[in-house]
Design a protein with these regions (language model features):
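A glycine-rich phosphate/pyrophosphate-binding beta-strand-loop-alpha-helix module
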Residues: 122
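DPxDG-like acidic metal-binding loop motif
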Residues: 125-146
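Short Gly/Ser/Thr- and Asp/Glu-enriched loop/turn motifs at secondary-structure junctions
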Residues: 309-314
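Residues at or immediately flanking beta-strands
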Residues: 105-107
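Single, functionally critical "micro-switch" positions that shape active/binding sites
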Residues: 128, 172, 308
Length: 357
C-alpha cells in the first residue's frame, strides 16, 4: 500500500525595521517573502525514519525515536556533530516529544534551496532555519492528524526554534514564516501567551522597496553574542541606545500602520544612525563597507536604505515613495557589484499550504 505524501512550505522573512531593539521589547516590522522551505513527509510502514535535507551540506540520516521522543541515530548513519544537523535533530526531538515518541516511521525530505545563492552556495540571510522549523512542525503535526492554527504553529515553532538555537534571538523570523503577510512583532511575554505578539498591517500605498544582497553571508549568532556582551559590560550605555532605537521603531511602526510612507522614509535613516552607534559600542560591523556602498548608491538615487536583519553582510532593503525613484534605485544597483533580489511579499492566506499526493 502506498501512503500519501504530505507536502508543505514556509516563507522566508525580510526585516524592515526594529532589529536588535526587538530583543528589548521594541516593535519590529517584518514581511514574509517568497523564498520557501519545502518539506515532504511520507509514511514508510516501519518504525524508522529516513531524512534527506538538500542544500544543508549534511548526509542523509536514518533514525528511530525512543519512548521520550528523542532521535536515536542508526549505527550506520554517517553523522558527526555539526550545527545544522544538531539544530534539525533538536526540532524533530521537540515535535516527537509532544507525541511521546509515538510517531510512525516516515521518509522526510527538506529543501531550502531558495535561501542560497545558486552559484556561490552562500546563504542570503532570509530566515532559512525559521522557515525550516515552521514547515517541519506543520508537516509533522499534519502527519499526526493535527492541523495547527497560525497561533498554535507560531507557539510551537518558537519553542522548537529556541530549543535548537539555545534560546538565541527574538523569534521575529518565526513569526513572519508562521503568520505570513506584513506584521508588527513584539517578543511575547512567554511562549505560552502570544496574544499580543503579532499585528497585521497593509503595505502603505506609495511605498516601494528593493532588496539587495551584499554578496557575503553573516553570522547572526556572532553579532547577537557581541551585543549581549555589551549589554552585560555597559548596561547604561546599552539601554540608552536601545531606548532611542525603540522610540524610532515605534514611530516607524505607527507610520507604516497609518499608511504614511513619507514619515516611514524619515524613520529609516534615523534607525540606521542608531545602528552605527550600536556597532561602534559593540565593536562589530553592522553597516559593513558593502552596506555603506549600497547605502550611498541608494541615497544618490533618491531613496533610503538599511541592512535587513543583524547586518554585517546578507541582505539590505531600500525604500522610496515613487515609481521613478524605485526604477532609478534598481538601475543603479544593477550597475553595481551587488545582487538585486526579486522578492515579493506572500499574503497570509498563501503562506502555508498543505497538499496530499
Amino acid at each position: 500500500m502506498k501512503h500519501p505524501r504530505i507536502s508543505t512550505k514556509a516563507t522566508g522573512k525580510l526585516i524592515l525595521l526594529g532589529e536588535y531593539a526587538v530583543l528589548e521589547g521594541a516593535p519590529s516590522l517584518v514581511a514574509a517573502i517568497d523564498r520557501f522551505c519545502h518539506v515532504h513527509i511520507q509514511k514508510n510502514g516501519f518504525s524508522i525514519f529516513g531524512l534527506e535535507a538538500m542544500n544543508l551540506d549534511m548526509p542523509d540520516l536514518t533514525f528511530h525515536l525512543d519512548e521520550s521522543g528523542k532521535v536515536i541515530l542508526a549505527g550506520n548513519s554517517p553523522y558527526t556533530s555539526e550545527k545544522r544537523t544538531d539544530f534539525l535533530i533538536e526540532v524533530i526531538n521537540y515535535v516527537a516529544s509532544r507525541y511521546e515518541g509515538k510517531i510512525p516511521g516516515a521518509y522526510i525530505s527538506i529543501d531550502t534551496g531558495d535561501f542560497f545563492h545558486r552559484t556561490s552556495g552562500n546563504k542570503f540571510g532570509l530566515g532559512s532555519s525559521a522557515a525550516l522549523t515552521v514547515a517541519l512542525i506543520r508537516a509533522m503535526n499534519e502527519y499526526m492528524g493535527r492541523n495547527l492554527s497560525a497561533d498554535a504553529l507560531f507557539s510551537e515553532a518558537i519553542k522548537a526554534h529556541r530549543a535548537g538555537q539555545g534560546r538565541l534571538g527574538s523569534g521575529v523570523d518565526i513569526a513572519a514564516s508562521a503568520a505570513g503577510g506584513v506584521i508588527e512583532y513584539v517578543v511575547p511575554g512567554s511562549e505560552e501567551d502570544i496574544t499580543n505578539a503579532i499585528k497585521r498591517h497593509k503595505w502603505p500605498d506609495g511605498l516601494y522597496f528593493t532588496s539587495v544582497w551584499t554578496g557575503t553571508s553573516a553570522s547572526t549568532r556572532f553579532m547577537l553574542e557581541k551585543v549581549k556582551r555589551f549589554r552585560l559590560t555597559s548596561p547604561d550605555f546599552y539601554h540608552s541606545i536601545m531606548d532611542e532605537m525603540r522610540s524610532i521603531a515605534e514611530d516607524g511602526c505607527r507610520a507604516f500602520a497609518s499608511g504614511d510612507a513619507g514619515k516611514f522614509l524619515e524613520v529609516v535613516p534615523a534607525y540606521l544612525e542608531q545602528e552605527r552607534k550600536l556597532e561602534a559600542a559593540c565593536g562589530i560591523e553592522i553597516i559593513s563597507p558593502s552596506h555603506q556602498k549600497i547605502n550611498d548608491i541608494v541615497r544618490n538615487a533618491g531613496g533610503v536604505y538599511k541592512p535587513s536583519g543583524a547586518g554585517g553582510g546578507d541582505i539590505g532593503v531600500a525604500f522610496c515613495d515613487n515609481e521613478e525613484t524605485h526604477l532609478n534605485i534598481q538601475s543603479a544597483l544593477q550597475d553595481s557589484p551587488y545582487d538585486l533580489l526579486d522578492l515579493a511579499i506572500v499574503p497570509a492566506e498563501k503562506g502555508l499550504p498543505i497538499s496530499y499526493e
